[in-house]
A protein has these predicted regions:
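Short amphipathic helix-loop junctions that connect adjacent transmembrane helices
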Residues: 8-25
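Loop-to-transmembrane helix entry/capping segments in MFS-fold secondary transporters
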Residues: 22-23, 107-119
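Helix-loop junctions at membrane interfaces in 12-TM secondary transporters
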Residues: 71-83
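Multi-pass alpha-helical transporter architecture, strongest
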Residues: 149-177
Length: 177
């Protein structure tokens, strides 16, 4: 929930909390998207060294740090720096979460599309719940900073489930039908 919520509401945060004009917000989105390319390669390299699960746990801790840092951001340049970090872990977490999920699909199945449809559905539900919670906290407290800080709770829940995840050991990659 937290990752998608941060990605969807980053520009809104910059607008409401920092008063950034549209051209600076567009630059922020470009920074995030371009850096995400490098982030996906970086975390692919890291996952070869420490494994998918440990890489995901590392990225979730970085996401928690991003949420805490967002609470304290006061300048456009701090926001750009945070956007750089968001892009780096966004690219990594999107690619590694899908590849890790693929490892959980039973090797005997030929219907991979159904599994990934479920993955996409849960992602969309997470966006709705995360955005609702973000808005609800903003309404209660009057600040998007508190909402960003509250997103740490979602990442803590994610760490809880990741810690219990056991990835199957496979000699070879599953064959796709």
């Amino acid at each position: 929930m937290g990752v998608q919520t941060v990605m969807y509401l980053a520009a809104t945060f910059g607008d409401k909390e920092l008063g950034m004009p549209g051209d600076q917000l567009i630059l922020t989105v470009l920074i995030i998207q371009l850096v995400a390319i490098g982030g996906s390669y970086l975390f692919a390299f890291i996952s070869k060294r420490i494994g998918n699960k440990n890489s995901l746990v590392t990225m979730v801790f970085i996401w928690m740090g991003i949420c805490v840092a967002a609470y304290f951001v006061n300048s456009v340049y701090q926001f750009y720096a945070l956007a750089f970090v968001v892009g780096m872990v966004m690219g990594g977490i999107q690619s590694l979460s899908r590849s890790t999920y693929a490892k959980l699909i039973p090797t005997t199945t030929t219907d991979h599309a159904s599994f990934f449809s479920f993955f996409d559905l849960t992602e969309k539900v997470a966006v709705v719940l995360g955005t609702f919670t973000y808005g609800f906290i903003e309404q209660l407290t009057g600040s998007m900073r508190n909402s960003a800080l509250f997103l740490v709770v979602f990442f803590v829940v994610g760490i809880f489930f990741l810690a219990r995840l056991t990835l199957p050991k496979r000699e070879t990659a599953p064959k796709l039908a």
